[in-house]
A protein has these predicted regions:
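Aromatic-Pro/Gly-enriched surface loop or interdomain linker
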Residues: 165-170, 174-178, 185-193, 240-347, ...
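Helical hinge/lid and interdomain linker segments adjacent to catalytic or ligand-binding clefts
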Residues: 199-213, 219-222, 226-228, 311-397, ...
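Secretory targeting and sorting signals
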Residues: 46-69
Length: 592
């Protein structure tokens, strides 16, 4: 019998509807907070198949290539002292003079053992890292918190921060997230000391229950070439020891990197309950058997802090483990948010694969059109989370800028745009009218439910697939604890399913609030004309499963899941997958 493993549930997830994510006192990103131990241990038992209880570690060595990039601050492992910074417009703090870095487009890419690699990524992660970015203590939600006027920025753009704190003073440390010799981040910039203040309560807009803060700007800085493209955590550090994060993606519109990692900020915003409202719940409890809650918000705003993850939302569990793995292996990556795809769908054709790492339910019409157009032109699509493209939303401006409010009335008839601009009307499901486009027509599987209390093994169903290359896994072998939270499965009853869907794993799961047994599927298919490949994991827990477990957990899935993930990178980063690995329909073996 295998030893016990634990299910971890983020504190902010509503009990009726959010992701149960595994984690622990982990050695890879030790010290992350914002998780609690789930209500029950679960024991993975044998089901007439081989259960992997102890996974042999595979030693993978990243080749470091020096291209003469100058080091930046960040070698320290304690909280860095702030240095004075120049005063920007309006009394804010702006970045001072800094050393220029080599252009990330300067060196050609090459095929490596784990996928398409880029020397600049290898060199960037050879720079001194730091563990000072980790928030390890228990933080008061109101000790220090903030938000930015942008969720993404590029070179030359100004970023304003709006901070409320009980501290007399605070400063900001900007960390680029990656591998950095296992330390996980590099310090790129620090502000000077800024006077702290407690900002006003954030008003709720009647009728739509939107919480949108009207705070005074605390400081600003300008992104310059020292801010290498990537995912950043801006750590707010109060003089009294208060700490929290503000996430920021720095993106490069000129990038032609093989891999686009797209942060699902729309879904993070939709589940952000700061101020008492999100698109799933309101300040008062749901009425019995009434879902979604009638008191929920109809519009949510980025003009407010994230209530969970010490201000980082779900980033550290649902996205960061993939960033860390890809940069450890020097993969040729660039970073977007889903707002990038919504605003610049035409740029997707410059890349080989679009990767949606975590929970990615909320998609706008322009996002979906961009992904479909890209796939029709040969761009591969990877959905590492479950329930992607589940709900149809639209973006609109807030007082701080364009595309900072996310709209979903859930009932399209209640949307003011219904009958006026049906292409932009919000919907509970993409498959309902007026869109009539189920997510499964693109991702190859449908959302079938969730389980936030228990995880289940991922069961191999196509052992000869490229996904399992080099693993030694045979048919019926299982990887413990991978299938959890939201689930996807192939549905043969849907007439518009893509052809040639290949079920790579077919895993028995139990859905909460439904006692019957279901399955969760990892699926893959290729398009006949463009040869693009589409991969869907079938679980929200794929990316969290990349994180090493506590030493006491002997049946940790991390090593095997990293191998599978790198197999996806190797195959999908080489160009249209159908040219080398065309899918072979096998769904009839499971749903015939």
């Amino acid at each position: 019998m295998c030893p016990s493993i634990f299910v971890w549930v983020p504190r902010h997830r509503p009990a009726h509807r959010r992701s149960g994510l595994r984690g622990g006192e982990i050695d890879d990103v030790q010290g992350l907070t914002g998780f609690r131990r789930g209500p029950a241990k679960l024991r993975i038992t044998r089901r007439g198949v081989t259960v992997i209880c102890v996974i042999a570690a595979a030693a993978v060595v990243a080749v470091v290539v020096s291209i003469g990039v100058t080091s930046s601050p960040g070698a320290n492992t304690a909280k860095p002292a702030s240095s004075p910074a120049a005063t920007g417009p309006g009394g804010g703090v702006s970045a001072g003079p800094t050393t220029q870095t080599t252009s990330v487009a300067a060196a050609a890419t090459f095929a490596g053992p784990s996928g398409t690699e880029a020397p600049w990524v290898v060199a960037e992660n050879a720079k001194p890292g730091t563990t000072a970015w980790k928030i390890t203590g228990t933080q008061s939600p109101t000790g220090i918190m903030g938000y930015a006027n942008r969720v993404q920025a590029s070179d030359g753009q100004s970023v304003s921060l709006y901070v409320s704190t009980a501290a007399a003073r605070f400063h900001v440390d900007a960390y680029r997230m990656g591998y950095y010799g296992g330390k996980g981040a590099r310090l790129v910039w620090s502000s000077g000391q800024v006077a702290g203040s407690t900002q006003a309560a954030c008003p709720v807009t009647p009728g739509i229950n939107m919480v949108e803060c009207k705070w005074t700007q605390s400081l600003s800085f300008t992104v310059n070439p020292t801010w290498v493209q990537g995912q950043y955590l801006l750590e707010l550090v109060g003089s009294g020891g208060q700490e929290s994060y503000v996430p920021l993606t720095v993106w490069d519109p000129s990038s032609t990197a093989a891999y686009v990692v797209m942060s699902g900020v729309l879904t993070e915003a939709v589940f952000n309950a700061f101020g008492g409202y999100d698109l799933y719940q309101g300040a008062t409890p749901c009425a019995p058997n009434h879902y979604p809650c009638s008191t929920r918000a109809r519009v949510v705003s980025f003009d407010r802090p994230f209530a969970s993850g010490n201000g980082a939302g779900g980033y550290l569990s649902l996205m960061y483990p993939l960033t860390r793995l890809m940069e450890q292996h020097g993969l040729d990556v660039t970073y977007w948010t889903d707002i990038t795809l919504a605003e610049h769908p035409n740029l997707l054709g410059k890349h080989k694969v679009l990767i949606s790492p975590g929970h990615d339910e909320e998609w706008s019409n322009s996002m979906r059109q961009g992904a479909v157009s890209g796939a029709n032109a040969g761009v591969n699509l990877v959905f590492f989370g479950a329930s992607p493209i589940l709900r149809k939303v639209r973006l609109q401006a807030s007082p701080l800028g364009a595309d900072r409010e996310v709209v979903n009335y859930r009932n399209p008839v209640k949307d003011p745009l219904y009958g006026v601009d049906n292409a932009r009307v919000s919907q509970n499901w993409w498959g309902q009218a007026p869109a009539n486009l189920p997510a499964s027509t693109l991702v190859g599987a449908k959302y079938v439910g969730f389980n936030n209390l228990t995880s289940f093994p991922m069961v191999v169903s196509a052992p000869s697939s490229w996904l399992y290359a080099g693993t030694g896994l045979g048919a019926g072998a299982s990887i413990p604890g991978v299938m959890s939270s939201d689930f996807q499965a192939y549905d043969p009853a849907r007439s518009a399913n893509p052809p040639n869907v290949e079920v790579l794993s077919h895993s028995p799961v139990t859905v909460q609030f439904n006692p019957s047994r279901h399955y969760a599927d990892t699926v893959f298919y290729t398009m006949a004309s463009s040869k693009a490949g589409v991969f869907t994991s079938g679980t929200v827990n794929w990316i969290p499963s990349l994180v090493a477990c506590a030493a006491s957990v002997s049946n940790c899935p991390a090593t095997m899941m990293r191998k599978l993930t790198l197999n996806v990178m190797r195959v999908f980063g080489a160009g249209p997958v159908g040219a080398t690995y065309p899918s072979t329909a096998n769904w009839q073996s499971f749903y015939g």
